[in-house]
Amino acid sequence: MRIIRFEESSGFVLAAVTDEQQVFPLPHSDFMELVRESEQQQTTPLRLVQEMMTSVQPLEKKLEDLTLLVPLEAAEVWACGVTYERSREARNYEATGGKMDSATFYDKVYDAKRPEIFFKSTAARTVGPNQDVYLRSDSNWQIPEPELGLVLTREGKIVGYTAGNDMSCRDIEGENPLYLPQAKMWRGSCSIGPSIRLAETVSDPYAFEIICRIYRDGEKVVDGSANTSQLKRKYEELVEYLVRDNSLFDGTVLLTGTCIVPPDDFTLADGDRIEIEISGIGILTNPVKSQATKNISI
Ligand code: DO4
Ligand code: MG
């Protein structure tokens, strides 16, 4: 069972639930409203949507014909780093100029009790399915980071799973780790979607298959896959550090780190198309644009 948000031709935004065959509109403005109503009714989001599906007509349009939006407008997106061996290896490569000759703080954080967690994005910087992600104009080495996202209540309860892209500049971070916020955060540097999978419908959250494909001029130039079984840490451990002495917004998204890194000689280019597919969540597709073509004001 997956929750989506979409825009009607009138411009009206609706949340909806899909069982893959059909799409049923929900009377909620977004996923967190559904979660809160289920709490008030002392039921679960799954039971609530199942009940609603018996009393509303499905849309005439199919899922693939809808204009999807971010599945929730997360006020904050946070992200974890170096939670997979592949990320540690890639970070060491960029920090040592490819020499990999000495232990780094990335080795340290991979093994440390405290995970790396950083602030990634705000609602205004985050885009949804089929919307453009943007390249930084002062970086020559940029990649998508395909990651599983945890959807959290303000108490830190995991109520859903989504897919996310932690767009990153390997040259800026590699030059100096203190540049991390600049390597990670700019307009259009984060995407989430296409849906939220209800947590209670996932029997093993350490068995998500993650696939990343990048297309250039119609050709597939990157094709990588990974599985959340390779994650070094537990989700509860990551959330525990995020909520510690912190206040969360309802619907905060926590990206759990990347295990797919394109080849070291690869950098994203204007016109590329990124696809991030997570089993049971769907395909998050984003065209890549250079900042020169963007016209926004945040
Ligand atoms: O240490 C930098 C961040 C690494 C990261 O974003 C990841 O592992 O996904
Ligand atoms: Mg990342």
Predicted regions and their residues:
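Generic N-terminal segment detector
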Residues: 1-86, 103, 237, 286-298
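Short acidic-glycine loop/turn motifs at beta-strand connectors
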Residues: 7-10, 17-22, 152-157, 215-219, ...
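A generic structural motif
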Residues: 30, 165, 227-228
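Buried hydrophobic positions in well-ordered alpha/beta secondary-structure cores of metabolic enzymes
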Residues: 3, 15-16, 81, 150, ...
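Active-site microenvironments in enzyme catalytic cores
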Residues: 47-216
